[in-house]
From Swiss-Prot:
One of its GO terms (biological process) is response to amino acid. GO terms for cellular component: cytosol. Keywords: DNA-binding, Transcription, Transcription regulation. Residues 4-65 form the HTH asnC-type domain. It holds the Pfam family HTH_AsnC-type. It comes from Pyrococcus abyssi (strain GE5 / Orsay). This is Uncharacterized HTH-type transcriptional regulator PYRAB00550. The lineage of its organism: Archaea, Methanobacteriati, Methanobacteriota, Thermococci, Thermococcales. GO terms for molecular function: sequence-specific DNA binding. SUPFAM superfamilies: Dimeric alpha+beta barrel, Winged helix' DNA-binding domain. Residues 23-42 bind DNA. PANTHER family: LEUCINE-RESPONSIVE REGULATORY PROTEIN (PTHR30154), TRANSCRIPTIONAL REGULATOR, ASNC FAMILY (PTHR30154:SF50). Transmembrane segments: none annotated.
């Protein structure tokens, strides 16, 4: 990408590992002053390379003990209003990721739920309220163990 060099790549890689790293620590890793690192980070943000910062959270503290990956086979993967239809789902606190993808199931949704009943309730709403006639079928996988999330190794 134009305007991005090896030092920028290292900065991004380090921020992905630990977005709370200090500018001074980051500067030591790349051989720059904290001020120079700050300028580079601001440039990366303006270019859209860095889109935001987030925390990896243990959702069990919020009573959500079950993580599920829901794949949806769409009737029409190129439906022009798909992004608009997905807006309520994208705003749900417990839905962390939504992807349009290739393959047999063109939509993937990752979310956390209190229990199987709350997951089933979401699946019912997903089919009947949010996706109505857009979903042909769904496939659900329950996450048994999480080893890495948002670039952070958990175990």
């Amino acid at each position: 990408m134009a305007g991005i060099d090896e030092i920028d790549e290292i900065i991004v890689r380090e921020l992905r590992k630990n977005s709370r790293i200090t500018l001074t620590e980051l500067g030591k890793k790349v051989g720059l002053t904290a001020s120079a690192v700050k300028n580079r980070i601001e440039k990366l943000e303006k270019l859209g390379v860095i889109k935001g910062y987030s925390a990896v959270v243990d959702t069990s503290f919020f009573g959500e003990f079950l993580t599920a990956i829901i794949e949806v086979e769409l009737v029409d993967p190129e439906a022009p209003d798909l992004a608009k239809v997905l807006q309520p789902i994208l705003r749900m606190r417990n839905i962390s990721d939504v992807y349009k993808k290739s393959g047999e199931f063109q939509l993937a949704i990752r979310g956390t739920f209190r229990d199987v009943d709350s997951l089933n309730s979401f699946l019912k709403d997903l089919r009947k309220v949010y996706l109505k006639n857009l979903a042909r079928r769904m496939r659900v996988s329950i996450v048994l163990e999480n080893f890495k999330e948002a670039g952070v190794i958990l175990k």
